[in-house]
From Swiss-Prot:
Belongs to the universal ribosomal protein uS9 family. One of its GO terms (cellular component) is cytosolic small ribosomal subunit. Residues 119-138 have a biased composition (Basic residues). This is Small ribosomal subunit protein uS9. Residues 99-138 are annotated as: Disordered. One of its GO terms (biological process) is translation. Transmembrane segments: none annotated. One of its GO terms (molecular function) is RNA binding. InterPro entries: Ribosomal_Su5_D2-typ_SF (IPR020568), Ribosomal_uS9 (IPR000754), Ribosomal_uS9_bac/plastid (IPR023035), Ribosomal_uS9_CS (IPR020574), Ribsml_uS5_D2-typ_fold_subgr (IPR014721). It comes from Nostoc punctiforme (strain ATCC 29133 / PCC 73102). Residues 100-118 have a biased composition (Basic and acidic residues).
Length: 138
């Protein structure tokens, strides 16, 4: 969804991403490439981990737009890995709204695919989802 920012009048591009239990609502605003997550600097939020930051900026790097848009994120649920992957999906979806021609390169890189893997539920009679109690022959 494209909305004009009430204060500055700049276009704002929205995208929502989900992964495991994490949900990220992402806004792309024309700017200098800053990442803000839940009101904090993105580097601080993701503990200066280059893996998380690289995952998040990958869709922008694919299109060569690293320093052209600020990323504003509201992330909740899950852990840092799930949140980072959900932010990546949200950024990719927002970039598709920015320009429909962005879709094919993002699709080929797999950035528009929602990862369906989630934690498997625990079954009764087992210790965890699949871990059975130790077998005793006698």
């Amino acid at each position: 969804m494209v909305v004009a920012d009430a204060n500055s009048g700049r276009a704002v591009y929205w995208g929502t991403g989900r992964r495991k239990n994490a949900v990220a609502r992402v806004r792309l605003v024309p700017g200098t490439g800053q990442l803000t997550v839940n009101g904090k600097d993105g580097n601080l939020y993701f503990q200066f981990n280059p893996n998380y930051l690289g995952v998040i900026k990958a869709p922008l790097e694919t299109l060569g737009l690293e320093n052209e848009y600020d990323i504003l994120v509201k992330a909740e649920g899950g852990g840092l890995t799930g949140q980072a992957d959900s932010v990546r999906l949200g950024v990719a979806r927002a970039l598709c709204q920015l320009d429909p021609d962005n879709r094919p390169p993002l699709k080929t890189e797999g950035y528009l695919t929602r990862d369906p893997r989630a934690k498997e539920r625990k079954k009764y009679g087992l210790h965890k989802a699949r871990k059975a109690p130790q077998y005793s022959k006698r």
